[in-house]
Each structure stands twice: as C-alpha cells, then as structure tokens.
C-alpha cells in the first residue's frame, strides 16, 4: 500500500511566504528558504509552492527562489504559478522542481494540459482546482485567479465536470483546494472530497481546512485521499508533522516514517 503524504503548502507573494483565510487577507509568514528547510527536515513527504499572484499578474514563478530551494532541500517539491507554456514548465523542472502544477492557465487553455503531459509525462503534471461551494445554487464551482482578490472570479466550470475534463486530458494528480474551508481550521471538506474521490482515477490531494491532527486522519480514512496539504497549522506551529504521522500510524494509515525520510539526507 502506498504511503499517504503530508504536504506543507507555502503560498508565495513578492518573494515571501504568506497565508490568508478563504483566499483573502494574506499575512506575511516569513522567508521561503528557512520554512522550506524546516519542513523538509521535520518529516514532510513533499512541499508545494504556490506563487499566488503570478497567473493574475501575467507572469511566471520567480526562478531565483526555485533554484535556491532545490539546492537546499532533498524532498520532492511542486511549483505553481503562471506556468502557461512548455518553456515555462521546462524552466521550473530544470531548476529542480519535481512537479509543476497549473490552475488558472489550464482554465484559460485546457489544451495546455495535453501539451505538458506529452512533453514531460503524466507523473509530473498536477492540476490545482479552486472549488467554491455556492450555497444558493448548491453547486461546487471552479474559480480562477484566486490569488488576487481584485481578479478572482467564477469560471464556467462546475468542479466535478472540470475534474473529469482534466483527467481525460492526462493530469497526473489533482489538488482540490476547498475555498470555503481555506484557513479556517475547521476540517477538510470531507463531503466534497468523498464525492469526487469516485470520479478521480489519479491521486487526489486534499487542501483547505486542517486545524487539528484528527482532521488529517479523517481526510485519509473518510475521503480516501492520497495526500493532505496544510499551511497555517504548520506555519503557526500548532502541531508538528511528526505528531500528524504518529496519529496516522496509530490509525493504521500507511505512512512513510520520518526516520526513512531522514536516511535519504
């Protein structure tokens, strides 16, 4: 059985790590490299970096910090933000990223998914989906440009339809960012994750809502996700990655021991 992944998420804006609540009101957390090193050394299975305003600003990720991160950590990491072409993706991968994630650019040009998969292989192409539950319609809607409050808006897609579309185009992994839960620490959206799990034939990563160690256990046991992203609980030192993994192991969830990670250093 494949080990489930615990994945700290670092939202980057203007060269620093930030964190918001429901994709709004971001506060500065700190510098990229010290946080990346801390998480890598404390047992993270991988890291995800989102340059949250790159797509809305019409630019791509700043190459300088990607290269520095690759030199300093020895666990896999994914980079996202404004990757709109083979050239952009090639640059990030050549700088040391293991995977690239695309979100708004894929909504603007779905064929980009096919192109990137053909060029680099399914295993390193991740699709991020920012999903918002509309209480009035009772539907889950895909939003885009969510890193910039002034440009964030609903797309033409409902979440399940977009999930199936990107998988049909070759996406190798899905990160489901549940916008209603983001930053509020009340638990992952188990209902939405469970509903989509049956339509997702590739690894599904939960994102948005972690506030307690039990929330990770619930996501793995109840929604059967393959990995769980978290940001504020780790940034604020509410608990450690080792505590999360200990709880997972105690609940018979397959986990990669921290000792095994440290042996690769």
Swiss-Prot record:
UniProt keywords, alphabetically: Amino-acid biosynthesis, Cytoplasm, Histidine biosynthesis, Lyase
Subunit structure: Heterodimer of HisH and HisF.
Entry function: IGPS catalyzes the conversion of PRFAR and glutamine to IGP, AICAR and glutamate. The HisF subunit catalyzes the cyclization activity that produces IGP and AICAR from PRFAR using the ammonia provided by the HisH subunit.
Entry keyword Ion transport: no
GO cellular-component term (any): cytoplasm
Pathway info: Amino-acid biosynthesis; L-histidine biosynthesis; L-histidine from 5-phospho-alpha-D-ribose 1-diphosphate: step 5/9
Subcellular compartments: Cytoplasm
Subcellular location, principal: cytoplasm
Family to which this protein belongs: Belongs to the HisA/HisF family.
Provenance organism: Idiomarina loihiensis (strain ATCC BAA-735 / DSM 15497 / L2-TR)
Top enzyme category: lyase
Location of the active site: 11, 130
Catalytic reactions of this protein: 5-[(5-phospho-1-deoxy-D-ribulos-1-ylimino)methylamino]-1-(5-phospho-beta-D-ribosyl)imidazole-4-carboxamide + L-glutamine = D-erythro-1-(imidazol-4-yl)glycerol 3-phosphate + 5-amino-1-(5-phospho-beta-D-ribosyl)imidazole-4-carboxamide + L-glutamate + H(+)
Protein name according to UniProt: Imidazole glycerol phosphate synthase subunit HisF
Superkingdom to which the source organism belongs: Bacteria
């Amino acid at each position: 059985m494949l080990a489930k992944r615990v994945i700290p998420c670092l939202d980057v804006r203007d060269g620093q790590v930030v964190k918001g609540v429901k994709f709004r009101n971001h506060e500065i957390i700190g510098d990229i490299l010290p946080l990346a090193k801390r998480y890598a050394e404390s047992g993270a299975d991988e890291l995800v970096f989102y340059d949250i305003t790159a797509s809305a600003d019409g630019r791509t990720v700043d190459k300088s910090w990607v290269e520095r991160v690759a030199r300093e950590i020895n666990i896999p990491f994914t980079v996202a933000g404004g990757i709109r072409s083979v050239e952009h993706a090639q640059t990030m991968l050549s700088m040391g990223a293991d995977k690239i994630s695309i979100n708004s650019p894929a909504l603007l040009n779905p064929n980009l998914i096919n192109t990137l998969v053909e060029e680099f292989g399914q295993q390193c192409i991740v699709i991020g989906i920012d999903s918002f539950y509309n209480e009035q319609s009772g539907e889950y809607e895909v939003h885009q440009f969510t890193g910039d409050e002034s440009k964030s808006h609903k797309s033409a897609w409902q979440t399940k339809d977009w999930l199936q579309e990107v998988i049909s185009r070759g996406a190798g992994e899905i990160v489901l960012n549940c916008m209603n839960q983001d930053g509020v620490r009340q638990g992952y959206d188990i209902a939405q994750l469970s509903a989509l799990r049956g339509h997702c034939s590739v690894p599904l990563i939960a994102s948005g809502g972690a506030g307690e160690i039990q929330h990770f256990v619930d996501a793995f046991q109840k929604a059967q996700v393959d990995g769980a992203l978290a940001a504020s609980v780790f940034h604020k030192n509410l608990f450690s990655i080792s505590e999360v993994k200990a709880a997972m192991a105690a609940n018979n969830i397959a986990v990669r021991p921290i000792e095994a990670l440290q042996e690769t250093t």
